[in-house]
């Protein structure tokens, strides 16, 4: 059975039920999967250190093929971890801190409610 976007997930913990928004949970899982990769973690660190960078800046700094850097940036972008900004012919990538903070709060809430 496939969950609808407006449904909730109920976790049982003893006599206590924990209700979670299914759509928010899916978004959190997407972000966690995206950042659970060494290279993508390095990309995030570089972007945090430099505020914003082009794909060229990133692949030179990380000594990667351009296509590899682009693929990993696309995964991070789809997950909402990084955002893009066009300046002339250049596209700059930056960490979307608001999105990261939102997911972080959701994960904290989940771990508090499940007692882990």
Model-inferred region functions:
Residues 60, 77-78:
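Alpha-helical residues within the helix-turn-helix
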Residues 73-74:
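Short, hydrophobic-biased segments on the C-terminal half of alpha helices
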């Amino acid at each position: 059975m496939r969950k609808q976007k407006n449904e909730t997930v109920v976790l049982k913990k003893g006599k206590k039920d924990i209700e979670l928004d299914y759509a928010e949970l899916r978004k959190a899982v997407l972000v966690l999967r995206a950042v659970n990769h060494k290279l993508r973690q390095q990309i995030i660190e570089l972007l945090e250190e430099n505020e914003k960078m082009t794909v060229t800046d990133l692949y030179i700094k990380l000594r990667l093929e351009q296509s590899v850097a682009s693929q990993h940036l696309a995964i991070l972008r789809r997950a909402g971890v990084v955002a893009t900004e066009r300046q002339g012919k250049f596209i700059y990538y930056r960490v979307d801190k608001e999105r990261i903070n939102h997911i972080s709060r959701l994960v904290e809430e989940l771990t508090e409610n499940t007692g882990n």
